[in-house]
C-alpha cells in the first residue's frame, strides 16, 4: 500500500485506485476460497437485525469496528450521523430498514472528535451541514 504514516501518526496519503481494485479482487478471491457459497448467499435477500446510522468519516468502518460480516448490519452514513425528517435519503433508509428488512434495532453512533459535530457546535458549518 502507498499509505505512509507521518511523525504525528497521521496518514499522509492512501492507496491508489489500482491498489483499491487489486485489494477488492484479492478479497473476493480469498472470500470465495474460504466460503465458496458466500457470493451466492449474499445475492439473496439480506436479513440484518440492525440499522446503523453513523458518520461518513473514513476512519470509522462499520464492519471492522463492530466485528460484523456483510449482511449483518444495514448501514446509513452521513456527516455527523444526522437524522432529519426532511432528508429523503435517511428517510428512505429508515423506511426500508424498518418496513422492508424488519430490523430489530436502530443504532445511531457517533465517534470521538467528529469534525461534523464540531462544526455544528462551533457554528462554522457551511451549506446544509
Q: Where would I find each of the regions flagged by the language model?
A:
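Short, conserved "active-site rim" segments that organize catalytic pockets and cofactor/ligand binding
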Residues: 2-84, 88
Amino acid at each position: 500500500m502507498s499509505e505512509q504514516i507521518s511523525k504525528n501518526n497521521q496518514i499522509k496519503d492512501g492507496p491508489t485506485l489500482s491498489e483499491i481494485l487489486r485489494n477488492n479482487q484479492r478479497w473476493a478471491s480469498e472470500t470465495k476460497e474460504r466460503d465458496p457459497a458466500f457470493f451466492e448467499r449474499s445475492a439473496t435477500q439480506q436479513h440484518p437485525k440492525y440499522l446503523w446510522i453513523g458518520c461518513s468519516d473514513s476512519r470509522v468502518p462499520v464492519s471492522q469496528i463492530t466485528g460484523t460480516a456483510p449482511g449483518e448490519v444495514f448501514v446509513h452514513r452521513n456527516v455527523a450521523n444526522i437524522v432529519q425528517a426532511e432528508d429523503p435519503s435517511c428517510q428512505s433508509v429508515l423506511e426500508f430498514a424498518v418496513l422492508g428488512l424488519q430490523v430489530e434495532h436502530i443504532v445511531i453512533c457517533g465517534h470521538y472528535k467528529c469534525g461534523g459535530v464540531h462544526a455544528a457546535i462551533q457554528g462554522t458549518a457551511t451549506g446544509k451541514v
